[in-house]
Amino acid sequence: MDPQLPETDLVIFDCDGVLVDSEELSCRCLAEAMVKAGIEMSTERALELFLGRSTTALVDYCRGVGKPLPATFLPELAQQVRETFRSQLKPIAGIAAVLAELHLPYCVASSSDLERVKYSLELTGLASRFGPRLYTAQMVEHGKPAPDLFLFAAGRMRADPRRTLVIEDSVSGVMAAKAAGMKVWGFVGGSHYRLADGSALLKQAGADRIFAAMTDFWNEG
């Protein structure tokens, strides 16, 4: 038990927008790729629609607007995101210090695919902090906002959902954590929240606490 988190046995971190400052980068790549495929989209709109969601949500959206994605779309998008991350991705400021000070089991539960999570953590020097404790939407039937992924991660980590704390930056992620019966803190320090008021969105979704800098992680209240 960590004396600073007395009723918590496990901390689950989302990856994009919580560990790495990737949301604006990836949604910019997505918007550009969608426009190229003939689907109207902007970075801001992509953030509204797909923040914290899995690839399934993207595929379903495109089908819904009568523009099913070509077979080459997702592989080409993944490559573009990878190239963008290689030159521009940074860790969220202060996250390394939080992980170093955390004396509880912790893991990642992300809507991104496993290879992208691994790549993001390797680029930002965080991979060794998590080892194999990486759980993604590919591993469950229903992605966020369903609770499946967080319950799966807690099960793998042998933790009681009621004693699990989730750190999330998206509405769908906050909703998923609450549906899983977990405590959730909404983090709004990613660069994508320059474009929207994340605090109000995450609070409305059910976040138990909102904070905007990892230096405030331990300053609950």
Model feature map: region roles:
Residues A33-M34, S54-P68, S120, A154, ...:
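Helix-loop "lid/cap" segments that line or gate small-molecule binding pockets
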Residues M1-D9, A100, D113-L114, K118-G221:
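Asp-based, Mg2+/Mn2+-dependent phosphohydrolase catalytic module
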Residues D2-E48:
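Active-site neighborhood of HAD-like aspartate-dependent phosphohydrolases
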Residues E40, D60-A97:
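Metal-dependent phosphoesterase signature
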Residues L19, Y106, V166-I167:
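Conserved SAM-binding loop
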